[in-house]
């Protein structure tokens, strides 16, 4: 019951009903509207603290951007610019989750991320490594399988289904997770696609992604698949889910060049337009280039952090083979060690692998495919033999790669 001008005082703050707007009457006491508002704030902060403690989030222990980048350096070679952007973005995102309910009415907005870079430059690895560092639910989604409602393929909500599955259906944990949407460039708007069996232009999928990126409560089918009326749904609030999108955006260099009024090739190539580095046009990428490529403005606006990944040069590819904590060569050495065999690689073998990765234009992702082809026979035969050491020589590597289906690697 609400009372007014009865002479009653708030049992919490002692104010009379004449000093406040409302006085709520209970069985054995009274509470004013101001104490109700304050109690609501205390409850919200307490519930947020409980949820954060379950996920190990605390402002004092939250890794700083330099700590995040140092961890990334252990697993990802190069790409310092992208690492810095990601480290700051992730740090600010989780500070936002730790924000207390205050009176200043300053609400920190979510900053989703889009990474542009050629295949094999480390987009997926960066996102996966950050999720590993923070120990939060993480899932990778291929944008090419997503379709708008009514077409064959996966619904947009399947993204959240996968995140829920990774989080063991802990909704609170999933609502603070990270989603990496790969191949985001493949759903760019295209007007010349005649298909009638799926989303024709890609714009429908982009429109469907908007509600996830901006933050809204989405009803998710727990086991995935299409929705039907009698199915039980799980409501998931996406406002605190960090979305990282990645794509190769093949051909976007021409869009950048057009904007900079610089031709990439041709008789009209400009020698020097504001000292533009035409060998790495990606460093000049801007949101308007993504729009020209086919992403709708609403999608671009909900991914305010745009960063690029440089093409990997020979030195970077060589370091990827040996330097990271879980480098390719270290993984094979560990596998052989489990069989009691000491494995080693000659230096010229590693140079040969890099040569082939560059020749096939596979980037870092192709390094493993090449090494796997070289190592297949010895991994099959050695466990049954009594050998305790094995050295991969250049002649052996060449012979094994010639036996392998090289065209398959080149076309992968």
List where the protein language model places each region.
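AAA+ P-loop NTPase nucleotide-binding core of proteostasis motors
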Residues: 2-34, 41-78, 83-139, 143-152, ...
């Amino acid at each position: 019951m609400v009372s007014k001008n009865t002479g009653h005082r708030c049992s919490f703050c002692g104010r009379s009903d004449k000093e406040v707007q409302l006085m709520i009457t209970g069985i054995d006491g009274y509470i004013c509207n101001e104490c109700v508002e304050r109690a609501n704030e205390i409850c919200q902060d307490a519930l947020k603290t409980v949820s954060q403690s379950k996920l190990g989030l605390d402002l004092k222990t939250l890794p700083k951007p330099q700590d995040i980048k140092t961890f990334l350096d252990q697993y990802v070679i190069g790409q310092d610019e992208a690492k810095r952007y990601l480290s700051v973005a992730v740090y600010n995102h989780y500070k936002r989750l730790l924000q207390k309910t205050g009176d200043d009415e300053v609400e920190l907005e979510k900053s989703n991320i889009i990474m542009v870079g050629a295949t094999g430059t480390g987009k997926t690895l960066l996102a996966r490594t950050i999720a590993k560092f923070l120990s939060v639910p993480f899932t990778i989604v291929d944008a090419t399988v997503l379709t708008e409602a009514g077409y064959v393929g996966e619904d947009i909500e399947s993204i959240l289904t996968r995140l829920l599955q990774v989080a063991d259906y802990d909704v609170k944990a999933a609502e603070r997770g990270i989603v990496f949407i790969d191949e985001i460039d493949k759903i760019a708007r295209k007007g010349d696609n005649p298909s009638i069996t799926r989303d024709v232009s890609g714009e429908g999928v982009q429109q469907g992604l908007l509600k996830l990126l901006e933050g809204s409560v989405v009803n998710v089918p727990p086991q995935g698949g299409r929705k039907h009326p009698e199915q039980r749904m799980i409501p998931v609030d996406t406002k605190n889910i960090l979305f990282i999108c990645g794509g190769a955006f093949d051909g976007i260099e021409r869009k950048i060049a057009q904007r900079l009024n610089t031709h990439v090739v041709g008789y009209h190539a400009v020698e020097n337009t504001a000292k533009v580095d035409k060998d790495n046009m990606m460093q000049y990428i801007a949101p308007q280039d993504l729009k020209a490529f086919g992403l709708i403005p609403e999608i671009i606006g909900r991914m305010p952090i745009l960063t690029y990944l440089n093409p990997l040069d020979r030195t970077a590819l060589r370091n990827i083979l040996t330097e990271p904590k879980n480098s390719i060569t270290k993984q094979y050495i560990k596998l052989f060690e489990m069989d009691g065999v000491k494995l080693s690689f000659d230096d010229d073998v590693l140079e040969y692998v890099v040569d082939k990765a560059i020749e096939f234009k596979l980037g870092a992702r192709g390094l493993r495919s090449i090494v796997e082809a070289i190592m297949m026979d010895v991994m099959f035969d050695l466990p049954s033999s009594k050998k305790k050491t094995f050295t991969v020589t250049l002649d052996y590597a060449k012979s094994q790669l010639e036996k392998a289906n090289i065209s398959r690697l080149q076309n992968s």
